[in-house]
Amino acid sequence: MSAPAQPSSASAGSSAFAVEQLSPDFGFYLRTTELLAECRSPMQHIEIVHTPLFGRAMRIDGCFMTSERDEFFYHEPMVHLPAIAHGDPRQALVIGGGDGGAAHQLLRYPDMARVVLAELDRDVIDMARAWLPAVHRGAFDDPRLTRHLGDRRAFIESCE
């Protein structure tokens, strides 16, 4: 993981707009005030930026992944709907999820004995752990969490 970097598109204390184009006709932008950390892993470019609206946000290859103030819109429905439908979840597999938000939600279930987090890129976990504690809320330190790093498909195929 690389050391924190200063903003590349704005000087410290000023603003810039991060733009994510989703199609030729649609996209969104978000004002960022600081590039808090940046890492170029062998697989992708990971940034942690500060935004006035959403607090700290993670971007991967220029795409917004999660932020401190809206992560629940994503993690809670993704975890709780299947967990409620199941009725008594005791173990779960999170594919991707290196920000730790889904793992945190799963670990809130008192009978959850084991959560496996299968993530391609260790640097995503390291950046989230260091910069997004409001998203993972300590999930990475829970002894019920096991991390598998690398090819997720190969991992699933190796499971019994």
Summary of predicted features, one role per range:
Residues 2-57:
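N-terminal auxiliary segments of SAM/dcSAM-dependent transferases
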Residues 7-18, 41, 66-160:
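The AdoMet/dcAdoMet-binding core of the Class I SAM-like
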